[in-house]
Amino acid sequence: MKLQFNLKAYFKTSADPTPAKDAIAALFEEANSTLLTRGAPEGQGAKVTEWKLGEDRIELTLQSGRYVRVHDAIFRLRKQLAEALGKKYKIGIRGIEVESFIIKVPADHELRMLKVPYIKSMENIEGGIQLELEVGEAEMKNRVPDRILTLLEEKIEAAQYGAKAEHWNLLWQREPMEHPFKEDPTQAMMKEGWLKRGSSRGQWIHGPQSARIFRTFEKIVLEELLEPLGYREMIFPKLVTWEVWMKSGHAKGVYPEIYYVCPPQTRDPDYWEEVADYYKVTHEVPTKLIKEKIAEPIGGMCYAQCPPFWMYVAGETLPNEEIPVKVFDRSGTSHRYESGGIHGIERVDEFHRIEIVWIGTKEEVLKCAEELHDRYMHIFNDILDIEWRKARVTPWFMAQEGLLGLAEENTVGTTDYEACLPYRGPDGEWLEFQNVSINGDKYPKGFNVKLQSGDELWSGCSGVGLERWAAVFLAQKGLDPANWPEEFRNRVGEMPKGIRFL
């Protein structure tokens, strides 16, 4: 099956168009071979396949493929008809009414019904999917059918991608190591008083010992990677608005995983008095009442750490001599709503991360990524001395945004770093604890960032998740500093005492 559009519609006329029947017939015949083929390969333009006249209308059926789509074709015809009928016959075109709009899209996999505006019905048919749209003149002019088609094709491509096994490719793996420690590090840390659960799901309070480990990881990243490679520290916002996520592309699918932010409708104390009074009397927080008094979500808590940075450079032009731009942020927590039950520090809703971002030409971005890979290998082999591997994967946004072709070229994509967790057993699932992503022109285009020379800008990012580093290191080395690699132990120094309780 090929992509097919079928539109049944009519032009509303100011008078009976019958006197102009011959002129209309000639116009449609001519348009099928000229007007409706412009911009399309030979034989792939749109066509008027049927038409008839009514007292106050010109009814027609249009068919097309991917080129000169029917909703574009009908506006081309409107302009020609208005000129032809207006001059000679004094008949005006008052608007367009749509009777049916059907798109047939080739697909190898069935899809669930899309629950979005303007879709009247969706059916899985032999060889593809059939959509019936409920659109009018305004929606066609605003290219709503194109956006619906793009959404559907992205979902088809993502379904095909999900059926493949090739989106995880092993690049390198360290030789197997002996791991005497076999405990779950989270349980061991809790038992030794290194950390306790916070009051919110997926949240931990880190004691002095755990905090020392985190700060040592940060120091290693600063001294062994960020400073030698010339990265400058910034502070990124941790409340992210819809505007940012729309530009970054996250607005296409982030909703199940973010913590939403809703501001008060007003700061007027009188407006909130009944909430405060309710608590004073009942000693319960009236969450339903609060829900009535807060505004709609303005965005959410930091999810992926780098998008807010891009508002700093949005709409700007970078001088040639200023690239590559290399920055990092370690100023606060990120938040991600994790599914399932209770997890350890390897899977949390609130976590600490150093986010590394770089911008430059394609060649510069690829070079920066290689530099990071080299420094990470040094850290994981020579300082932490862990058993790990790295694999090339395709990130979620590419499957979601129809960018899989770029990933297959092996330039745009993500390299995941994974480590074994001995307590899970020899056949247990490895944990992804680090990544390096090359995002192509996704962010510079989304935030309208340009280069003085006019050359295309690319970007990359890499997140250092401190909880994941701790989960991996402590799972393999345990909590006893005597069993840690000497290089790491020297950087930690004397471990602080924990807080004692009776």
UniProtKB/Swiss-Prot annotation:
GO terms for cellular component: cytoplasm. Binds 1 Zn(2+) ion per subunit. This ion is coordinated with 2 cysteines, 1 glutamate and a water molecule that dissociates from the zinc ion to allow the coordination of the amino group of the serine substrate, which is essential for catalysis. Binds 2 magnesium ions per subunit. One ion coordinates the alpha and beta phosphates of ATP, and the other coordinates the beta and gamma phosphates. Consists of two distinct domains, a catalytic core and a N-terminal extension that is presumably involved in tRNA binding. It is an enzyme of class 6 (ligase). Zn(2+) binds at C306, E355, C461. Mg(2+) 1 binds at R336, E338. Catalyzes the attachment of serine to tRNA(Ser). Is also probably able to aminoacylate tRNA(Sec) with serine, to form the misacylated tRNA L-seryl-tRNA(Sec), which will be further converted into selenocysteinyl-tRNA(Sec). Its cofactor is Zn(2+); Mg(2+). One of its GO terms (biological process) is seryl-tRNA aminoacylation. It catalyses: tRNA(Ser) + L-serine + ATP = L-seryl-tRNA(Ser) + AMP + diphosphate + H(+); tRNA(Sec) + L-serine + ATP = L-seryl-tRNA(Sec) + AMP + diphosphate + H(+). NCBIfam families: PRK00960.1. It comes from Methanosarcina barkeri (strain Fusaro / DSM 804). Pathway: Aminoacyl-tRNA biosynthesis; selenocysteinyl-tRNA(Sec) biosynthesis; L-seryl-tRNA(Sec) from L-serine and tRNA(Sec): step 1/1. Keywords: Aminoacyl-tRNA synthetase, ATP-binding, Cytoplasm, Ligase, Magnesium, Metal-binding, Nucleotide-binding, Protein biosynthesis, Zinc. Mg(2+) 2 binds at D416, E432, N435. L-serine binds at A304, R336, R353, I354, E355, Q400, N435. It is found in: Cytoplasm. This is Type-2 serine--tRNA ligase. Homodimer. Transmembrane segments: none annotated. Belongs to the class-II aminoacyl-tRNA synthetase family. Type-2 seryl-tRNA synthetase subfamily. InterPro entries: aa-tRNA-synth_II, aa-tRNA-synth_II/BPL/LPL, Ser-tRNA-ligase_2_arc, SerS_tRNA-bd. Inhibited by serinamide, unlike type-1 M.barkeri SerRS. ATP binds at R336, Y337, E338, R347, V348, E432, R468.
